[in-house]
């Protein structure tokens, strides 16, 4: 099996590839489209959709929101890329880039890691702060404009490390997990080979503000 995206074929180093998933197609399992990114130092990570059941469900009915945009964070650059998949699903269009400096300024966080659509916005966790330390946490983007809305937490408590997260909407509860700060997880330009994430020991539980 050859990789569908070869490093030598990427003009800038980062790209999103589209693979044919129709078993009846002659190109099944092969790369059929590609969108190159302007920069190549992002370390693209767990991307997600702008809308999902959490936004369309009875708790938060937004029937006219289209599930068409991919929101793609970069743990190294702290950039956030937004791609429109509707016009040409084989070659999504890059319609917005939020620079890492804007993420730092408006949220106080760095190294965005995972995206989940929520009832009142797009939730994104970050591993830490712009200086490579902590605490990490969660910030939000607008579903329609993708403008940064700031931090989600109102009262952090002892939580310091951040990784992934999900919720029980009916109970207004979120569970987060731990990993490491940008310096210790390799998501910072100042990371050293001797820095390693500490083993996670807790899964903080939150009451939605």
What is each PLM-predicted segment?
Residues 1-3, 9-11, 27, 40-55:
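Acidic and/or Ser/Thr-rich intrinsically disordered tails and linkers
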Residues 1-10, 57-68, 72-73, 125-135, ...:
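Short, conserved, GDST-rich strand-edge loop motifs in beta-rich repeat architectures
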Residues 85-169:
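Asp-box/WD-like beta-propeller blade repeats and closely related beta-sheet repeat scaffolds
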Residues 13, 26-31, 88-95, 146, ...:
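Residue-level signal for glycine
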Residues 43-66, 108-119, 165-172:
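Structural signature of eukaryotic scaffold interfaces centered on beta-propeller domains
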